[in-house]
């Protein structure tokens, strides 16, 4: 429960962060399908003998090349199979956290027997859509997720409809925190971060705990493209400076290496993405450590980073052709700038420079190479902060950047929401042709 004296708008900010910043084990698109399969299996009478699944093109894009934790295998079929045979239907984005070695073996056997199919849902007007149907003989159960990675809208079995989400908001029901967030500004978010009681936001420190553990695992060098571990080696060899800038990139990319490589550790996600959560967290943690920040300063910086990232991403489709590590890194830029001097002008200049720098980075599906984009975004964020500290930034005379940071954000999000839709279709077409 919230302190009744807390500003009602601030309460909605905190709710937005609590809704959007959650632990997630494994890349969230395959995990969304695994969750649908797990919930369906929980409704089925008897053991699962067959799994059929349908997903949106965007979800297919983000599930083709990513490793499912604990399996050593990539793709949506193993995610669906393991969700059905070893998933925890009540664990949300951590649906696979309790999967046993036996469940993994059973899932692989089901796959090898040709009993698992995943197809693109046609037609499909939803950006994020996953449906899993599990069978035991003639008995079946089907679960549909739409709009959000854990947003179950329909459950049905051979006996009839079990649950259907109501589309309308009940009279007197409060609107979504994200709806409230769509009417705010970065200046209001900064005021909240500066003035909210520490006790109300202490929970955000969990993002540092989880993502630092993932980063440490990534530095072992056995996950994904091991970018973080490789860059750390280059520091030891004298090919890369041992400085704050390198540390930001190394520790951030290491967490993404472990995340995308299939490590069985959760990430603290942001806006439904583990990589976005990592990108919004690790640069801020590294800078906070450099300046010896205490828990309260770290919590305020992390809250600014995560809430700014949510605020920007809320103006985008849930999944798009724009790599959202870039928008999460804009949040990180805000958090790092706040740690250094706390001025709104510095924060807004850093975000504007980010928009002028990495806004063209595409999302070509979840894979080990996401860690490359995470490292690039983290590096760009710190560069933008350093520029802002010297009172320089990409200005409104250049490209899609406007004189006002809010308009710059709106311009970027309009680009991703509209004209980049054709880019997204082309990316999906290219990836589908490779998979044939």
Curated annotation (Swiss-Prot):
InterPro entries named among the record's database cross-references: Ser_deHydtase-like_asu, UPF0597
Pfam families given in the database record: SDH_alpha
Molecular-function annotations in GO: L-cysteine desulfhydrase activity
Domain of life according to the entry: Bacteria
BP-aspect Gene Ontology terms: L-cysteine catabolic process to pyruvate
Family of the protein in this entry: Belongs to the UPF0597 family.
PANTHER family on file: UPF0597 PROTEIN YHAM (PTHR30501:SF2)
Protein name: UPF0597 protein YhaM
Organism (species): Escherichia coli (strain SE11)
Taxonomic lineage from the root: Bacteria, Pseudomonadati, Pseudomonadota, Gammaproteobacteria, Enterobacterales
